[in-house]
């Protein structure tokens, strides 16, 4: 199954809808990236909420437009809160997205993520090693770092998407987005995106928010990847290194004009 190149014209159209809806996105993410994740969503026009207590997480997940579960700094108490939120989202038909950070390297989070799959995520976003591990095809990876190219994990992503009936995103130099039947590729970005903490985690939040949009989920999620790739390219051109990249990236998201970028390329 050969991937198709995602259309930037569609990404521009989707961004207009995203900004108009401003999806309320419940982010249960890791401690390292909370601020950057919230700022990424705000820059694009979404409304982030970082509700993590088990007592509050369950009811809030039911009223949010989307939920993100990121297991980067997972603890037993946080797993309890995440499970409560996912169950609530499932009952309320709120789309939720799983970011299985380092799932192949640590047994506790691997079992937790596998258990959550029965509650039908709308999307899963991970690097190649994480997707391979979650699909059961391989274990390993260096924590949050991947040891595989995204394309190598594409068959696993397609199989996982069919098994769970969801969208699976494998990120790398080229991102691949699949529903198991159709696959889209999104090139672009810049190596500087890998030299700061949180771009992948922030993408997962944007993917989660995009799942709240009407229309084809595959196209909406691929559009989310496209926005982040374009902003990364722009930010890299305007920065001198990781320290100046972060504010440039947030500015690029805020001013993102996919149609103009499409004309330039």
From Swiss-Prot:
Query: The organism sits in which domain of life?
Result: Bacteria
In which residues is substrate bound? 50, 198
Question: EC top class, in one word?
Answer: transferase
For this entry, the protein name equals Hydroxyethylthiazole kinase
Organism, as annotated: Salmonella schwarzengrund (strain CVM19633)
Pathway(s) where this gene product acts: Cofactor biosynthesis; thiamine diphosphate biosynthesis; 4-methyl-5-(2-phosphoethyl)-thiazole from 5-(2-hydroxyethyl)-4-methylthiazole: step 1/1
Cofactor(s) annotated in UniProt? Mg(2+)
Q: Which UniProt keywords are present, listed alphabetically?
A: ATP-binding, Kinase, Magnesium, Metal-binding, Nucleotide-binding, Thiamine biosynthesis, Transferase
Q: Which SUPFAM superfamilies match?
A: Ribokinase-like
State whether keyword Repressor applies. Answer: no
């Amino acid at each position: 199954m050969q991937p198709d190149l995602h259309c930037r014209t569609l990404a521009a159209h989707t961004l207009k809808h995203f900004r108009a809806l401003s999806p309320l996105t419940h982010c249960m993410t890791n401690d390292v990236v909370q601020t950057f994740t919230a700022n990424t969503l705000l820059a694009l026009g979404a409304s982030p909420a970082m509700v993590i207590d088990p007592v509050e997480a369950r009811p809030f997940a039911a009223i949010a437009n989307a939920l993100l579960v990121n297991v980067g700094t997972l603890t037993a108490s946080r797993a309890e809160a995440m499970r409560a939120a996912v169950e609530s989202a499932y009952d309320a038909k709120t789309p939720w997205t799983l970011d299985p950070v380092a799932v192949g390297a640590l047994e506790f989070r691997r079992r937790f993520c596998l258990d959550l799959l029965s509650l039908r995520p709308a999307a899963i976003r991970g690097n190649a090693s994480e997707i391979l591990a979650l699909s059961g095809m391989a274990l390993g990876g260096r924590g949050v770092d991947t040891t595989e190219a995204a394309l190598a994990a594409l068959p696993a992503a397609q199989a996982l998407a069919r098994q769970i009936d969801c969208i699976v995103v494998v990120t790398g130099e080229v991102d691949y987005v699949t529903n198991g039947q159709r696959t889209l590729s999104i090139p672009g970005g810049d190596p500087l995106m890998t030299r700061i903490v949180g771009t992948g985690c922030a993408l997962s939040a944007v993917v989660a928010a995009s799942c709240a949009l009407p229309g084809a989920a595959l196209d909406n999620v691929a559009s989310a990847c496209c926005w982040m790739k374009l902003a990364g390219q722009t930010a890299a051109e305007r920065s001198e290194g990781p320290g100046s990249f972060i504010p440039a990236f947030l500015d690029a998201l805020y001013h993102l004009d996919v149609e103009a970028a499409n004309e330039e390329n």
